[in-house]
Amino acid sequence: MQTVSSYGVELRKQNIPLRQTLEIYRSAVCYLTEVYGKAWKELSVIPDAKRRFNAAEHLVHTTKKNSARFDFDLRFPKMPSYLRRSAIQHALGMVSSYETRMELWEKEGKRAGKPRLVYENHAMPVFYRDVMYREGTEGRDEAYLKLYDGHDWKWFCVRLLHTDMEYLRKHWLGKKASAPTLERRHHKYFLRFSYTEEVILTKTSVKDQVICSVDLGINTDAVCT
């Protein structure tokens, strides 16, 4: 079977525009959520997820063959295409979840509080390889990220915590990592990498196995049994 492990590498404090990048990405998700909330009737009748995504992108992005209905390109000029698509996917998920909760609320007789479509979000950008993320020189604790400096999208060299990089070199050298996701914890920024690997399951009978189950609570800590 396949298992996925992840590890967050801390970005050392430096003068790079991470906050501006995070702000513009979340603003884009907020704007798109409002747009797709208004256009959900026409989007919801498209059953295929890929076709629905393409239709959603056509609503906000102008190309040679398509004229966008909404002014996303004017509000967020030069946003990298992969980041724009990530924001679109996140916004579609938020609107779809809201519409599902609304249907359930109406089906149950509108007894509980009415669901709200919340535009504020805590979305974190994914730095896709080559177009948003590049590895640094081999053996050096660095990487290159495409960030928004308040005027344009530019490449910045970011310094990574040495102990975190040593851990990755020791345990994950040669393994392919997914595109890293930006993460913010305790006023610090991290790049979280995920690694997929094949694991052979034990052939011990179920009766003789020790099984650990984890219940991840929404408002409580995890419960392990």
PLM features: what roles do these ranges have?
Residues 1-225:
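Nucleic-acid substrate recognition interfaces
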